[in-house]
Amino acid sequence: MDATFTAEQEEIRRTLRELLLKRCGPEEVRTAVQSEGGYDSALWETLAQQLGLPGLAFPEAYGGVGCSVTELALASEELGRSLAPSPLLATAVLSVPLLLAIGSEDQRAALLPRIASGELTAALAVPGASLTIALGLTGDNRGDWAGGGRAGGVQARRTDDGWRLYGQADQVLDGHSAGLLFVAAHTGGFARSRTLLFLLRSGSPGVTRVRLTSLDETRSQARVQLRDVEAELLGEEGESSDVAGVLASVGDSAAAVLAAEAVGAADRVLERTVEYVKQREQFGRAIGSFQAVKHRLADLYVQVQAARSAAYYAAWATAAGEERVGGLALAQALEALRITSSEAVQLHGGIGFTWEHEAHLYFKRAAGDELLFGPVHRLREHAADAARLFGGGEVAV
């Protein structure tokens, strides 16, 4: 592994950081999350058309940039520093890999250029509140999370006219505003139970999308209800796809990207805290000069740097084809963000507890991401189970 960033990677980080410093401060973030879409559409247009962010990690043949998960993780680290609300996670990290892995050539050719230009955003809808299970992050995703042949979840039924969907999906990131939905649905009953992926365009009859009130306002979520909705199968009819395996692979790469994003947020909130303790005075001296405060900040610094190393390795390893590395990096990064943001609230004193200060936004990001993709102990438990660390027998290599 070469830990040195290339000139192109450094340019991605530098350009994105400069843009976000100008256009995505705390007040801009608060304004953006109150908008109908939940993000700044003008900023998203700039990110798409000038920086090529939505198409960063897919081939140039479809209008993308042709980079890898590594570059996408580095870009997400910068977005995490400012908590920039955007459809990047839902579109480029969770949805595009599904289209690349399972979609037909016609579907890729029709949709990917529009995604790369920023014209089209996408979201992944899985039944109930099982996003972390569906992505294989905290458990085996070959279970009954998609419905399992019972009532509930999302059911797919084949008719003379095509496929029809019925059910409900919660925790759909950017589901209220996405122009394209990738829906995981159960079909086949008990005898031939399987999970398939379907495409739904914006405005499809029978689809109800409601934006939910979430703990982390910078990470918009929606509930999607489907009532006998006509849908298009992702991929070719008659072909058999390992949907669970593809979702687990997407979950692994998404975890690496999310780990980098969390590291960016933790690094920024630590920077702000260090700046503050140098200015705030007690007993005639800056509180940052007290040994106890120095020790706390030093511990936070070590934790953030360790999480950064894990996140960078996960991004590199995922791009190189390694599996089951993202979950552990995500666990370490989420823990670092939670501890750093909670310490930031305390070290900022009275102002850290106010709505006006941005410290609470970072704490909510940490808590919200653990609810969506964790919790940390289950991420680690699943990684240990996958490696057979405590089950006896030979340890998987």
What are these regions (language model features)?
Residues 1-80, 102-105, 114, 118, ...:
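Alpha-helical interface subdomain recognition
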Residues 86, 105-112, 121-123:
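Short secondary-structure capping/junction motifs at helix and strand boundaries
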Residues 125, 168-207:
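A short core secondary-structure module
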